[in-house]
């Protein structure tokens, strides 16, 4: 070592260390400011993806409106965009959509709304389901070509060059796990997708697909009335470090706090058939009984200065195995109300009272998982 070289290196190291500390301190200030802006939102890691997500996720299905069979009622685009912006302001980072939601409409609205705020969001979308105009029905196709084509179309509608999480929407009875996983690998290797997973799968189907690659995320229905995933799916995803997204936190509107004895559904609304993902919660007399039960839960929540949606979200969010719990939202007011739910910690005595009220529900018996027909 030449004379003075050691001193020079030490000096350079000291400067580098000092700059590193300054940079770290600046980043901490930025991070604190960012979190203050987010308010009381909580965040969790989504399994092994390395992606941090808001505990409350924005469910985009209702925003798809009524385009084809299986959608919700009409939704105002401007209100939907305002709701997305408000969610971002309050710290919601995860947005869950799909080509099937309004036949691409929900993706397009999300892409428009995010704009320059795309970097503040985690976009989850899906593939393998499309509308067949000739047959006038939804078709499931999860072969390699279909997945690649669907992803490209989603990227265009979302106005982005990458998707954070891409899920197979529903199991394809005629699909090839090897072909699906090959498509996933191509998309990840190209940088168009960060993480991959599935939705509405059984543990047996997960086993089959995982023989051909890594499944990082599973999405299933889960709420106070639908606890079927607790039997097999929850232990499975926990044991295999698979990120668990739950949908239906508000039981598809039942826990919105707005239903009453006069509640009915439009002809194009999927809930009009009464079946809620394999449970007859809204069928015949069950609907009236469950609305009555929900109103008792509403009274319980209001006696504690909360709303029914906040109670429903708090109940799902309290479970450590949940990476993010989705709730459908179509207005800024709904966003503001729902966000508060993740900050409510339910006491043991409150949980016992909730279970007593839930005992009056109807149509909760079913298989230990939702079977896609």
Locate predicted features.
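N-terminal binding-site loop/beta-alpha segment at the start of enzyme catalytic domains
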Residues: 28-121
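Terminal-tail/helix-coil boundary detector
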Residues: 36-41, 81, 265-303, 318-323, ...
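Conserved, mostly hydrophobic/aromatic
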Residues: 46, 58, 80, 95, ...
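Glycine/proline-rich, positively charged
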Residues: 67, 134-228, 232, 242-243
């Amino acid at each position: 070592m030449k004379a003075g070289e050691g001193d020079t290196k030490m000096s350079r190291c000291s400067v580098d260390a000092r700059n590193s500390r300054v940079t770290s301190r600046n980043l901490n200030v930025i991070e604190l400011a960012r979190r203050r802006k987010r308010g009381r939102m909580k965040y969790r890691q989504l399994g092994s993806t390395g992606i941090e997500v808001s505990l409350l996720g924005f469910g985009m299905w209702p925003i798809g409106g009524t385009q084809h069979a299986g959608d919700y009622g009409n939704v105002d685009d401007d209100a939907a965009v305002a709701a997305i912006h408000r969610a971002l302001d309050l710290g919601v980072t995860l947005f869950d959509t799909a080509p099937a939601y309004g036949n691409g409409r929900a993706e397009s609205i999300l892409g428009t709304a995010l704009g320059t705020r795309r970097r503040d969001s985690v976009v989850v979308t899906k593939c393998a389901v499309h509308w067949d105009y000739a047959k006038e029905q939804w078709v499931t196709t999860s072969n390699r070509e279909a997945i690649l084509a669907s992803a490209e179309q989603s990227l265009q509608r979302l106005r982005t060059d990458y998707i954070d999480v891409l899920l197979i929407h529903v199991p394809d009875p005629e699909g090839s796990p090897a072909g699906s996983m090959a498509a996933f690998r191509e998309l990840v290797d190209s940088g168009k997708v960060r993480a991959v997973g599935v939705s509405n799968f059984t543990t047996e189907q997960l086993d089959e697909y995982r023989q051909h690659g890594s499944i990082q995320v599973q999405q299933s229905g889960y709420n106070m009335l639908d606890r079927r995933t607790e039997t097999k799916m929850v232990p499975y995803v926990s044991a295999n470090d698979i990120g668990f997204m739950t949908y239906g936190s508000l039981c598809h509107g039942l826990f919105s706090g707005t239903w009453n004895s006069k509640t009915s559904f439009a002809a194009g609304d999927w809930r009009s058939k009464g079946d809620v993902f394999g449970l007859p919660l809204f069928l015949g007399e069950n609907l009236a009984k469950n609305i009555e039960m929900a109103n008792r839960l509403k009274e319980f929540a209001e006696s504690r200065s909360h709303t029914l949606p906040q109670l429903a979200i708090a109940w799902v969010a309290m479970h450590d195995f949940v990476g993010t719990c989705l709730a459908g939202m179509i207005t800024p007011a709904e966003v503001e109300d729902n966000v508060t739910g993740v900050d409510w910690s339910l006491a043991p005595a409150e949980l016992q009272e909730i279970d007593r009220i839930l005992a009056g529900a109807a149509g909760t018996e079913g298989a230990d998982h939702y079977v896609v027909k």
